[in-house]
Regions:
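Conserved catalytic or regulatory cores that recognize and/or transform ribose-phosphate-containing ligands
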Residues: 1-194
Length: 194
């Protein structure tokens, strides 16, 4: 069964090695890991970014589920491309799962990023220098990510991983793969292609 593996690993210098290792974890659970880079881009004269976008969506449509690496990327939240992919698969009605190699909650990560440019309002909530409230529901990331994963029957696994291993530690990923394999084995065939 095909499972789309979303995440910013595609930006790593050793992306191919990480992809191979993740595929091996999936194979041990009877799944085939699919990455955005697997499908050749259409040669139709469109700009490269648009061809990548189209190839990524085609890959997702071919998969029964998604596992998203939601480890904070260039800020306190997940990679926006990965977030889009998670929402796309959720919109297709496919099971979605997530993991993060940072255990700190979204609210505390956001406050750490804002530093002294955040303060408490009179009602006790935090706000930033633009007067915007800081989301703090004690969740792993934005409520729409945690909520979408939960609504899809998925899990959101976390691990407190040292910074040096942030993009290579696969313990939380492996737990997601095991959960996805159990979920996909126990659902009717028509549900995985909805």
């Amino acid at each position: 069964m095909l499972i789309y593996l979303a995440g910013p690993e595609v930006f790593l210098a050793d992306a191919a090695a990480v992809v191979d290792t993740k595929r091996a974890v999936c194979a041990r659970h009877g799944l085939t890991g699919v990455f955005a880079t697997d499908l050749p881009m259409p040669a139709d004269g469109l700009p490269e970014w648009h061809r990548l976008y189209r190839a990524n969506e085609a890959q997702m449509r071919s998969c029964a589920a998604l596992i998203a690496n939601l480890t904070p990327f260039r800020g306190p939240s997940a990679d926006p491309g990965t977030v889009y992919e998670l929402g796309f698969m959720r919109g297709l009605g496919r099971p979605v799962f997530g993991y993060s190699n940072v255990a700190a909650r979204f609210g505390s990560r956001t406050l750490a990023e804002l530093g002294r440019s955040a303060w408490r309002r009179a009602d006790g909530a935090w706000e930033d220098s633009a007067g915007m409230a800081v989301e703090d529901f004690d969740l792993h990331d934005n409520l729409m990510l945690d909520g979408g994963i939960r609504a899809a029957g998925g899990v959101f696994e976390t691990a407190a991983v040292p910074e040096a291993a942030r993009w290579h530690d696969l313990a939380a990923f492996a737990r997601c793969v095991a959960a996805a394999a159990r979920r996909l084995r126990n659902q009717p065939a028509s549900a995985s292609s909805a």
